Amino acid sequence: MKVMKLKSCFWLIGLLLVCNVYAQELCRADFLPKASAAFDLLTQKYSEERIVKEIRAKNVRWVTNLMSASAVFYKATHEKRYLDMSEQVFGNAIREWKKNEKLMHGKDDFFALQNLALAYEILQDNDRLPMGADEVMIRFADLHFDPDFVIDNNQGQERALGFVRMCNLFPDAPGVSHWKEYVDKMWHFWYRNKDVDETATLYASIHLNDIINIAIESDKVALLKTPEIRRWFERYRDQQAPSGYMPEYGDDYFFAYNNWILVFEKMARLTGDASFRKAAWKLFTIGYPNLDIKYFKPGWNLRQACDWAALAEVALLPTFFEKSDSPVRTSLVTTRTNRKGKTDIPDQLLLRASSEAGTPFIMSDLYASGTHQHPNLRGTINYFEVDDNPLFHGVQRHATDVRHGNTVVLMKENGSGFPFDEKGSRLFTNSWFTDCVDFSQSTETVSYTHLRA
């Protein structure tokens, strides 16, 4: 009887351990319904008329992103309405661009080609391409081709990914040899250092995702399996706060969320290391309940809607079976390689006793160089959390001077620039900003009754 009870006890402990392991991995049922529901809310006011207006307003970046996002949601959910949306957006864009080439250019349209090519591929696989699409696709690519734009940041990698996809889709296009030459040049530019000179959280996730996609789609995955690139991946995993949040530094303010979940899941599959899956799970678990209303607000918000497609892409990744993981490091200074090839440069100071939730954590950007740098904030506290609550956090994009570091805003009594008025000037000078904290309800110290703590 005692033996049976002991066996039952071991069985129960084993079951609990297995459940705990699986609980720290994202499951499709956890995130895909939430992602598609959010996408639906944010595109609630979708109509063909609205799409045509967006195209004619030269909203190239988000029109192409919408056509690829809806196509990816179709692949993940098999819901025909997403394929219909992608086909309609793509078809209208092709027709309008064919009539007026000037509509092919818009703000931040370096994001456009890779999304356009992805939408084309999925529509082609489902026999949904309109007549004359090939000619417009090649013309679009040629109009956005700049062989001298070689840089190791998100703008460069987005362009490179677009031309990788165009080379695969149109191997006989007149300009394909030039496209391939550009793609090879872009790959070599960052691969010689096996690092990217980027210093902002969200932008780093964009170019990491692009580089992984480029490797997958141009048969270079084996080139990512080096010790240097493994350390590069781990650098971002180790930056994750114990709560699961990704601290923001450099020119950042977007709250890097869905894209990092996707990147961590891809890193897990490239390395076979389950710690990256745990990082994705932690970020989703802490992030989703705390997302701003803008991520769900019904209406028409293409930026936020398309952001959710990253989770739809997670659902399309190969099944991951590996359970072994490497430990997240505690207090350390991470290192990096810069664009000039200099190695072992101090990057981020990370202070924590463990990676368990609730542990106090501090991060300071020691590098503050490279793309999207905020050099005046070097050495300040970029992020500080206690009990999973961020107390110091990134202030705003383009908030670059020293006033924007080591600052906790407690109360805004005067809206005239205090201290970084949301819609006011970030260059407000010749004024000291002060405020007071009411400690009347706090505890008196024994030695100094006039002080409270």
Residue ranges and their predicted role:
Residues 24-38, 231-235, 249-353:
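Terminal, non-catalytic domain-edge segments
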Residues 219-223, 246, 392:
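Substrate-binding/catalytic groove segments of enzymes
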Residues 11-20:
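Bacterial N-terminal signal peptides
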Residues 2-10:
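Bacterial N-terminal signal peptides that target proteins for export
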Residues 44, 48-232, 240, 252-253, ...:
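Aromatic-lined, polymer-binding surfaces characteristic
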